[in-house]
Design a protein with these regions (language model features):
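Catalytic cores and adjacent flexible loops of soluble metabolic enzymes
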Residues: 1-240
Length: 240
């Protein structure tokens, strides 16, 4: 992947077999250039710094026309940029409106925007990198150093891991906790064999080895086929 800044370099990159094109923010509104990029049919990573929604929409239409796989980066073109100007909420809008992948081109001096972006569905994080911010150059102060990059990558991996899936179900670790932490229906006091269960005869206590509280109403009116002591867990097999 590489970033061409004009049509000539774009064509040269295509000739040498580049696999994806990064469009820099300064070309977001360069329609003739975007059309040439679209014609390549290559995957496009589009930075949106300094842009407004309509400009992003215009660019996206071009790549949709040419059926380029597309990833949109939210970007704030200040070097470094202020955390409060990250505007990460727009990533959700990009994903919903354009049905494409999203990412963050981040120029802040914090790892927080990257982690928030991942929580919103970002699959790519771009950061400027330098061996040392003490080096000369206008890009150094907006770049991260090797140790910081290592920290960022670790935190992004952790964030992705913690994000999980959108279905709600107990994890494998939680399954081991259910028996001890959840509750069961137990006898409120000593109950004799043949007793017809009433709600005042039972209560809910740990552990969760017996009948779930979800079934509280279902056992009302059932007859015990054995004696149950106070606080003893009640099981389905205890009923006639």
């Amino acid at each position: 992947m590489c970033t061409p800044f004009e049509t000539r370099s774009l064509k040269e990159l295509v000739k040498i077999g580049i696999e994806a094109i990064k469009i820099s923010s300064d070309n977001l509104n360069n329609i003739p250039f975007l059309i040439e990029a679209g014609k390549t049919k290559l995957p496009i990573l589009l930075s949106t710094g300094m842009g407004n929604y309509q400009e992003v929409k215009n660019a996206v239409k071009i790549f949709q026309k040419y059926k380029n796989p597309l990833l949109i980066f939210q970007c704030t073109s200040n070097y470094p940029s202020n955390l409060k100007n990250s505007n990460l909420a727009v990533l959700t809008k990009f994903k919903k409106k354009f049905n494409c992948s999203i990412g963050l081109s981040d120029h802040t001096q914090s790892v927080t925007p990257a982690l928030v972006a991942i929580s919103l569905g970002a699959i790519a994080i771009e950061k400027h990198f330098t061996l040392s911010r003490k080096l000369k150059g206008i890009d150094q102060k907006a770049s991260i150093e090797p140790k910081e990059l290592n920290h960022l990558v670790k935190k992004c991996i952790e964030a992705k891991l913690a994000l999980g899936k959108d279905n709600k179900a107990p994890s494998e670790e939680e399954k081991n906790s259910i028996k001890n932490i959840r509750r069961s229906i137990v006898a409120m006091f000593n109950l004799q064999k043949g007793t017809k269960i009433k709600k005042e005869m039972i209560t809910i206590k740990r552990p969760g080895l017996g009948i779930s509280p979800n079934n509280f109403k279902k056992i009302i009116g059932k007859k015990l086929k054995k004696n149950k002591k106070r606080d003893e867990i009640i099981f389905w097999k205890d009923f006639k």
